[in-house]
Amino acid sequence: VVIMGILASGRYMYQAAAIHVARYSFYIGKDITGLSPEETEQALQSSISLVNTVFAVATAVGMFGAMLIVPKLIKRVSYKKLIVVSCILGFVSSFITFFIGYNHFWACIPFVILSCVPCGVINCVSSAMVGDCLDYMELTTGRRQNGLGNACQSFVSKLGNAVSTSVIVLMYILTELDLNKIGTSYTVNPLTMSHGIREGMFSLISIVPGISLLLCMIPMFFYDLTGDKKERVTKELAEKRVKEGIVISE
């Protein structure tokens, strides 16, 4: 579960890289040809703000929409299948986004929403999977380390954010952008950027998280706390608790 979470670190790119993609890849707005420097600056800032806002909304719709639906699906579908299916959906959607390209912003948005679905699924299901692992630990060792589960989830979250930031910095280096401009209000005209720069930054919210989602499926094929085994662990643990006089309050 921890390895899966680490390999899925690319899912944080949709939020972390949005402002950078808004600066260097997309421009949506009126034609800036012939505008004064002040009008051009205003148009560029307006585009950055709108792109960033739309990405925030799209990410929220995909992620939180999935988080609302997943609890209902958990009763009928295994955690393993939910993650694998959602990651395949995210992988395919991410690559479609990449091939649509940075010149078609609004056409990308539906697929960005679909790409964010695995983020919500992983957030929900990974917590439940950690709980199942703790059940298995308690059954086999007689000890339940809830703190270990919380620590693992916290570690994965922090590492994921760190990896996202590192990938953004790496992309700045690969595209030969000025690292000193990261986190500043510096404004550039993306229309004057080279194809390599625009596509490189665009890949941060398309192909990069897509590859991450594909990789994170690999550990799931080795996760076997599903189906009959999960039911057996749950049943035997409940019986063990009854024998030991342990009462778990709801």
Predicted regions and their residues:
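Membrane-embedded alpha-helical bundles of multi-pass transporters/translocases
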Residues: 1-250
